[in-house]
């Protein structure tokens, strides 16, 4: 039994997936969007909704959440069907269509599939401390939903990559006390962010705790009181008063069932034709960070371009007897789907 019939199934409700809804709608094609998360936005919303983004055309600065909100608003005229909290598990190929089956047993009939899954289904790498679960989502968080939550608080950031460095810079503006714990003195972040960190360290806006790692969390009923850190060289221990802990050790991601679909994979990315974004399988496309080809640049705007190319190629599948006469959106307006 088929639950939904649509033109394109989009796998992934991140920025590229949402923009695909708009691009397909501009070509009078409908979309059904599947995402394993329970909200629209992918990693942008789940991990860093307030993180500033600087390389979106016409926006000198925009937060990840604002970007998602704008993309959702832009795609609204095309009334997409979102299937959230579901995973696309199986694909069945027929002469004129595909069937997509989710882990909930939902069946969608479509003309084509666009995989816009980013890094795939993901979750944060947990801090290796025995009682970490007792504090998660209470005083230990793997993402920042609202910067205002940390106003005038004592906060510890653990990690040495881009996320840890970027959030240290941002949260130093609002916290009462900010600790940055890392195993090494060097941070793996952009040169510009590194300069900002050095300045904040010098001015005492951030307390640098290196080379240390977190040993123990102390508190009651999910509320942190203290964090014990241990020097990895001398074994010296420090007990620091902390209200919130933000571990940024990256995420673990995988393509899940997509790996079983007979699609050519290289380094956990889907190999595509850069001119059309087709995979090696009939009617299946991939766009955004999940896709790869020689010279690929992993930027959001690259994904937007790939989405447009894939939709234009799929148009000929959905409307085989209707030639595509290209028009600029200024002349065309918003079509009715």
Curated annotation (Swiss-Prot):
FAD binds at residues 35, 43, 48, 88, 122, 289, 330. GO terms for molecular function: ferredoxin-NADP+ reductase activity; flavin adenine dinucleotide binding; NADP binding. Keywords: FAD, Flavoprotein, NADP, Oxidoreductase. Binds 1 FAD per subunit. Its cofactor is FAD. Pfam families: Pyr_redox_2 (PF07992). It catalyses: 2 reduced [2Fe-2S]-[ferredoxin] + NADP(+) + H(+) = 2 oxidized [2Fe-2S]-[ferredoxin] + NADPH. It is an enzyme of class 1 (oxidoreductase). It comes from the Bacteria. Its EC number is 1.18.1.2. Homodimer. Belongs to the ferredoxin--NADP reductase type 2 family. This is Ferredoxin--NADP reductase. It comes from Ehrlichia ruminantium (strain Welgevonden). The lineage of its organism: Bacteria, Pseudomonadati, Pseudomonadota, Alphaproteobacteria, Rickettsiales.
